[in-house]
């Protein structure tokens, strides 16, 4: 088993976060959505301004590092979680906004460690659950099922420029 560290990311980590997204999205979404949509969504969600806005409006980002043979640490992925007040809800829940691990580190335990950190953050805040959106054809859907998330709904979101997100909404109750 790999030794993994999770640390809080800051504004100075935006380039790394963008880099992980740029390196994971082609293999994750390349057979699901067009390159034009990938480019649009990367600019929409991962520009310096977009990441700064997310960080400044309640989204917490975390970075996973794996210890290498030479005792050096290599950053391999990130996640983002934020409090969300759902329509009609009395309590605030949490949303897992993003969780990406570099292809070379998938299966290393980094994704599980990031998910565990996101769940810990939500539980410590007293949230009753955590939800997420995942593309219906993304293999991460199976990962989340194995971690106890249940499919709650499916939605097609118009994100502009003629593009849509065709997702499942999944939830983990604590």
Short names for language-model regions:
Residues 2-5:
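Extreme N-terminal starter segment of soluble prokaryotic enzymes
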Residues 8-14, 18-104, 115-117, 121, ...:
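Acetyl-CoA-dependent GNAT
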Residues 92-94, 128-141, 145-147, 154-174:
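C-terminal "cap" of GNAT-fold acetyltransferases
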Residues 102-104, 108, 136:
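Active-site acidic-Proline motif in GNAT/NAT acetyltransferases
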Residues 108, 125-128:
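Short coil/turn segments at alpha/beta junctions that flank glycine-rich nucleotide-binding fingerprints
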Residues 109, 113:
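Short alpha-helical segment within the catalytic ATP-binding CA
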